């Protein structure tokens, strides 16, 4: 229902904030032309069948693994804070950690879900409180970052607000990942992108790699994926800085392996 509500909304789905756009208006007018109720029910039925199909596929895979003697259990947690949760997990309980940390200067992920939250009955005060919990906008304790690249970039940032944003991002993300890494027995797969500060891409993948290799992990590879399609609109100039807008052209998958007792 939320997905359909977005489709029938005047909000531009390609922007990170609420805004009414000519493109969205044309989309809604096209949907409303003719029997829009039948169109709505048809789209709803399609979405329901998609969910049921995925659920059936998942249950079939789980049943097959159980028949093969490989008991599978999944624990799903929602609405949790990673920074807090990272301190509550048991040691060495996972074989792998696969995650995509938030981007630096993501400008509030909550913006993408703000309209949905309003529809679900959340107040503006509650939504504003959620936005303040996001990295790198929340206050987090400083933690050691074992990376020369991190220190070099840190020394080059003169603006206090950007320096605080930069520090909070790595203190929050690497602080949580470092604690979580202690629970991983084999490998970590970290998907990151080189977001920019003042139009300069920050080599976040390199900082992550240097930090974890200093902690004893082996860097097996960094895979690079070119971003072909984008959801968000692109502007020639960044309105916040007045500089040329630089969107990430690639994303990086950093693969790290825990060394054995022989250091291999």
Over which residues does each language-model region extend?
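Conserved beta-strand signature within the Rossmann-like core of class I S-adenosyl-L-methionine
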Residues: 127-131, 186-193
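Short, well-ordered beta-strand micro-motif
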Residues: 255-257
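Nucleic-acid modification enzymes, centered on SAM-dependent nucleic-acid methyltransferases
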Residues: 1-148, 202-203, 208-210, 222, ...
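Short glycine/proline-rich turn/loop motifs
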Residues: 151-162
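A short glycine-rich, Lys/Arg-flanked "PGG" loop and its adjoining helix->strand segment in the class I
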Residues: 171-186
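Short alpha-helix
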Residues: 175-178, 203-215
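Acceptor-substrate binding/catalytic loop of class I
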Residues: 162-171, 192-206
């Amino acid at each position: 229902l939320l997905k359909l509500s977005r489709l029938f909304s005047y909000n531009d789905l390609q922007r990170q904030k609420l805004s009414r756009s000519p493109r969205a208006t044309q989309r809604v007018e096209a949907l409303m032309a003719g029997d829009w109720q039948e169109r709505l029910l048809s789209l709803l039925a399609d979405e329901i069948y998609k969910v049921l199909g995925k659920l059936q596929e998942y249950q079939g895979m789980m049943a097959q693994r159980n028949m093969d003697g490989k008991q599978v259990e999944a624990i799903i947690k929602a609405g949790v804070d990673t920074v807090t949760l990272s301190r509550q997990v048991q040691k060495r309980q996972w074989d792998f950690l696969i995650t995509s940390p938030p981007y630096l200067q993501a400008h509030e992920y909550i913006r993408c879900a703000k309209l949905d939250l309003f529809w679900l009955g959340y107040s503006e005060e509650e939504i504003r409180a959620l936005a303040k919990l996001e990295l790198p906008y929340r206050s987090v304790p400083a933690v050691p970052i074992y990376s020369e690249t991190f220190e070099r970039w840190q020394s080059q940032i003169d603006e206090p607000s950007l320096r605080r944003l930069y520090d909070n991002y790595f203190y929050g993300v690497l602080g949580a990942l470092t604690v979580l890494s202690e629970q991983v027995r084999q490998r970590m797969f970290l998907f990151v992108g080189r977001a920019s500060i003042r139009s300069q891409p920050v080599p976040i993948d390199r900082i992550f790699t240097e930090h974890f290799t200093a902690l004893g992990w082996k860097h097996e590879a960094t895979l690079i994926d070119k971003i072909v399609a984008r959801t968000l609109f692109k502007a020639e100039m960044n309105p916040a800085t007045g500089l040329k807008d630089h969107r990430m052209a690639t994303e990086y998958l950093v693969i790290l392996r825990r060394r054995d007792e022989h250091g291999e």
